[in-house]
Swiss-Prot record:
Superkingdom: Eukaryota
Protein name: Photosystem II reaction center protein Psb30
Cellular location(s): Plastid, Chloroplast thylakoid membrane
GO biological process: photosynthesis
Signal sequence region: none
């Protein structure tokens, strides 16, 4: 596998993992405020 493919897969995984995390943090902030 080339480095470019690995980088694309890594960025995709990051988006999939961080997406719900960020939404949860924003929801928690709104709930606290």
């Amino acid at each position: 596998m080339s480095i470019e493919v690995i980088a694309q897969l890594a960025s995709l995984a990051l988006i999939i993992v961080l997406g719900p995390l960020v939404i949860g943090l924003l929801a928690a902030r709104k709930g606290n405020l």
